[in-house]
Design a protein with these regions (language model features):
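Domain-level marker for long, solvent-exposed, non-transmembrane regions
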Residues: 2-208
Length: 208
């Protein structure tokens, strides 16, 4: 099993920080403006960061590369049979839908100097097969029929997709993706806070 984790994109992080420092002139959202915990400058930083993250829509946080090995058999008139084996590598991406993030998911404790962010649930993207690296082995009389070969190919790819989704849902991979999401989003909030002169504020992200 091979796992690859996409590096945090520095340009995106810079965009969040610069977006706050240069362009933000909007009033603070009323739902947090009068909570009694937020200082106005910190609130503006957090509000702008949330909007920037929402603009990201789906944030890619983790990728898994695996291999599906499946096979299928067919018979015709109880006399002729065919078998096809398929081995195909594929990549599955993990996302957090940040368009669902709101200021209600962000809280700030000035005394503890702590920002808490509640993240939307982790989602898994579609399976991206690497067809150029796939291997197919056909056997049996039915494999002389191109239509039968194509029918078995379609069945095998359905099975391969299911196999990859099952692999991607393993607890170890889900936990790794969640950890990466927490690290990425925490960094998204910490950088503009540091620029705003609040390096003392710690950010903790958790899932809802």
């Amino acid at each position: 099993m091979r796992v690859s984790t996409p590096a945090l994109i520095a340009t995106h992080l810079g965009a969040v920080a610069v977006g706050w420092a240069v362009t933000d002139k909007r009033p603070v959202d009323e739902q947090v403006k009068h909570t009694g915990f937020f200082q106005i400058d910190t609130t503006k930083v957090l509000a702008t960061t949330v909007e920037s993250l929402r603009d990201e829509n789906r944030l890619l946080v983790f990728s898994y590369k695996g291999d599906a090995r499946v096979w299928t058999e067919r018979t015709k008139w109880w006399l002729f049979g065919g078998r096809q084996e398929l081995s195909v590598p594929a990549v599955v991406n993990y996302y957090v839908d940040l368009s669902d993030l709101t200021l209600a998911d962000v809280s700030f404790n000035e005394t503890a100097k702590l920002v808490t962010v509640r993240l939307p649930k982790l989602t898994i993207g579609d399976v991206a097969f690497q067809l150029e690296n796939s291997t197919t082995i056909n056997g049996g009389l039915l494999t002389w029929d191109d239509d039968q070969v194509e029918a078995m190919r379609k069945l095998n790819y359905v099975s391969a997709r299911r196999a990859m989704v099952a692999q991607a849902q393993q607890t170890g991979l889900i936990n790794a993706a969640r950890r990466r999401a927490i690290e990425n989003v925490s960094n998204y909030f910490e950088i503009p806070l540091r620029i705003a002169g609040r390096p003392d504020v710690k950010v903790i992200a958790t899932f809802r």
